[in-house]
Amino acid sequence: MTGKFTKEEVIGVVFSKLRPSPNDVFADIGCGSGAVTEFFAPYVRKAYAIDIEISDEARERLKRFDNVVLLEMDGKEFLKKYSPDVVFIGGTKGVEEMLEICNARRVVVNAARIEVALSAARKMREKGIFREIVLVNAAKSYELAGGLAFRSLNPVFVVFGER
C-alpha cells in the first residue's frame, strides 16, 4: 500500500475529520512515508503505522516518537487483531474489507480515484457510519517571471465515517 506521501494540506483535512483526543489510539493503514502518523503522533496516546513493507523513510521519520509502533502487516489483519479509536486508510487495496472489520469511532479513507471513494462511501453507508466525502483541491505557489503562480496538487477524496 505504499505510495506517494499524503500532502500536508490533505493531512490537515484528515485531522479535522478524525479529531483525535489525547487518550486515543490511532492507526495509519498504508502508512507509506509515515507523514500522516508523524502528524498525528503528538496528539494521541499511541499511534500504529501499518504497511505491508515499512519504508526506510517512514522508519527514519517516526523513530523519534515513543508512542509510535511500526507494524509490517496487512491492514485487514491489523484490524482483526487491534481496536484503534481513529483510523486513517491511505491505501486502496482491500478498503471495503477493512471497513467491514473496522470498529473505530471515526475512520477516513483517502482516495485519488472516484471509484475507490464511492466504494468506501457505499461500504460506510452499509455500516451506518458514512458522513461525507470531501474533495480536497489545493495549489501551491511557485516563482514565475518575477511573480507568483500556482501549481495544483492532485485532488484527493477524503471519505469520512463516524459512529
From Swiss-Prot:
Q: Provide the protein name.
A: Probable cobalt-precorrin-6B C(15)-methyltransferase (decarboxylating)
UniProt KW Oxidoreductase keyword: no
Pathway, according to UniProt? Answer: Cofactor biosynthesis; adenosylcobalamin biosynthesis; cob(II)yrinate a,c-diamide from sirohydrochlorin (anaerobic route): step 8/10
Q: Where does S-adenosyl-L-methionine bind?
A: 6, 30-34, 51, 75
- For this UniProt record, give its keywords in alphabetical order, as a comma-separated list: Cobalamin biosynthesis, Methyltransferase, S-adenosyl-L-methionine, Transferase
Enzymatic reactions: Co-precorrin-6B + S-adenosyl-L-methionine = Co-precorrin-7 + S-adenosyl-L-homocysteine + CO2
Highest classification ranks of the organism: Archaea, Methanobacteriati, Methanobacteriota, Archaeoglobi, Archaeoglobales
Q: What organism does the UniProt record list as the source?
A: Archaeoglobus fulgidus (strain ATCC 49558 / DSM 4304 / JCM 9628 / NBRC 100126 / VC-16)
An example GO biological process term is:
anaerobic cobalamin biosynthetic process
Q: Name one GO molecular function term.
A: S-adenosylmethionine-dependent methyltransferase activity
Q: Which family does the entry's similarity section mention?
A: Belongs to the methyltransferase superfamily. Archaeal-type CbiT family.
This enzyme's EC code(s): 2.1.1.196
Q: Report the gene name.
A: cbiT
